[in-house]
Design a protein with these regions (language model features):
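Specific aromatic-rich, kink-prone transmembrane helix
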Residues: 205, 243-261, 423-426
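Start-transfer (signal-anchor) and selected internal transmembrane alpha helices
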Residues: 2-35, 54, 58-130, 307
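Transmembrane-helix motifs of polytopic, lipid-linked glycan transferases
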Residues: 79-87, 190-213
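Membrane-interface helix-loop-helix junctions at transmembrane boundaries of multi-pass membrane enzymes
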Residues: 301-306, 371-394, 433
Length: 455
């Protein structure tokens, strides 16, 4: 066959691929510039008037290059996932793939946390004066404490106001650690291990959702990126990683319910977890946006929806019956937020710097994937990639609403973890996954070794 008889499609395909890669790189470069701008402008503001209350804008962190006992393990996990992750994700049986993602994600998070050492990285993270373990002894009588919970939210309303994180969350967050203590798993070490091990299952919830609503091929392509997410820098050790897992499984069960997988059971279980989610964190009420995206994508909504709603009311009814009123507590939290750094931090800076923080949380690969997801949505082709784009868009909208609320000024590298994880599946749309995975790993390793993060 002569060359003039060869089809032109391969050349066109190569041209399109090169064009798309350039656009991916432009998107990544724009994200780098956004973060650089936030760093420069934030440093100027902090040096001028100190209103940001962060030492290394836009992150709550200190510049402190260091290595630690977790360094060799973190590098080893990164190399292994980059080298073998995509191939294993393509061929492992589905359940084994989920187990592998959880194992790799857990190892990645533990090793990154241990770069700061066992004490600072894990055992002491949840024992500071702001954290949940400081108030375990005040929950000896749980019903009485719940009835009186709102009396201690605002500073000045009580001589024993709650520390920041207890005041800033509904009581289910603190009760988690109270019950861990009661079953013999008390102290910062067990709390840290709990948050990392449970938090690592969030990736599985995301993958189950993508498989149910988009397709298995995209879920498999996303798997290595969820296992090796830069977000692990803040997942270990943070209670928000645990919150992210509860919320992710609520979404996953809803996705299974609306696609016909035991709709009554999965619908009820999803509702129960959604009810728990909003009593772990006020901000996670915005998961209603992600849930709405799931309902839009689901084809069998009618049967599971009543069960999901019935499950959802259980946790709120229990807490309300015990004397804790969510809406009253949130109103008092707004006052408490304004009493602290949140009342001083300038929204004009944080409204865009918060987004710059997410560049480090989700990585440049996710930025490129989001560009591709946006292109797919604009084409409006009803493909698996389009459905994935809708799911990712739901998470992005929830994040933007949180940003505009003014209740998320700074520290969003931790606070928005439950939303950020849902952006990572966009990486499934990228070709050449190993190069992008390597970029994700290098970013996480640099952040963890150059900075001492606040979380």
């Amino acid at each position: 066959m002569t060359s003039d008889l060869l089809p032109e499609a391969p050349a066109d395909t190569r041209t399109t691929a090169r064009r798309d890669l350039r656009r991916d790189l432009y998107a990544a470069a724009a994200a780098v510039l956004l973060f650089a701008a936030a760093a420069v402008v934030g440093t100027v503001i902090e040096h001028r008037d100190g209103t940001l209350f962060v030492n290394w804008p836009p992150l709550l962190a200190y510049w402190a290059p260091h290595i630690g006992p977790g360094t060799p393990a973190a590098i080893a996990v990164a190399v292994a996932v980059v080298a073998y992750g995509p191939a294993l994700a393509a061929r492992l049986p589905w359940r084994r793939l989920l187990l592998a993602v959880w194992a790799a994600g857990t190892a990645w998070t533990f090793s990154l946390a241990l770069v700061d050492g066992w004490q600072r990285g894990i055992a002491r993270r949840l024992t500071t004066r702001y954290e949940y373990l400081q108030v375990i002894d005040r929950f000896q009588d749980i019903p009485a404490t719940l009835r009186d919970f709102t009396s201690h939210i605002v500073v000045g309303a009580s001589p024993e106001h709650w520390p920041a994180h207890i005041a800033g969350h509904p009581p289910a967050a603190t009760l988690t650690f109270v019950y861990l203590d009661r079953v013999g798993l008390g102290g910062g070490a067990w709390a840290g291990v709990w948050c990392i091990t449970v938090g690592a299952t969030a990736a599985l919830g995301v993958l189950v959702t993508v498989r149910a609503l988009a397709d298995e091929k995209l879920a498999r392509r996303a798997a290595p990126f969820l296992a090796l997410a830069p977000a692990a820098v803040w997942m270990g050790t943070s209670a928000d990683g645990y919150f992210a897992a509860v919320a992710a499984w609520a979404v996953a069960l809803l996705a299974l319910a609306v696609t016909g997988h035991r709709p009554r059971r999965t619908g009820l279980a999803s509702g129960l977890l959604f009810g728990l989610t909003v009593f772990l964190s006020y901000g996670l009420t915005l998961y209603v946006v992600i849930a709405a995206a799931v309902l839009v994508l689901g084809s069998r909504r009618a049967r599971p929806l009543p069960f999901a709603l019935a499950g959802f009311v259980v946790v709120p009814v229990v807490f309300t019956a015990m004397g804790f009123y969510w809406w009253e507590a949130y109103d008092l939290l707004v006052t408490r937020y304004d009493q602290g750094a949140g009342g001083t931090r300038p929204q004009a800076y944080w409204v865009w710097a918060n987004l710059a923080c997410q560049v480090l949380v989700v990585g440049l690969a996710t930025v490129a994937g989001l560009r591709r997801a946006g292109a797919v949505l604009l084409r409006r082709d009803r493909t698996a990639a389009f459905r994935l784009g809708v799911l990712v868009l739901g998470a992005l909208v929830a994040m933007l609403v949180a940003d505009l609320s003014g209740m998320s000024k700074a520290e969003t590298e931790r606070i928005w973890l439950p939303f950020a994880l849902w952006l990572l599946p966009a990486c499934a749309l990228l070709p050449g996954p190993r190069a992008w995975l390597a970029a994700q790993a290098v970013l996480a390793l640099l952040v963890n070794h150059l900075l001492l993060t606040g979380w």
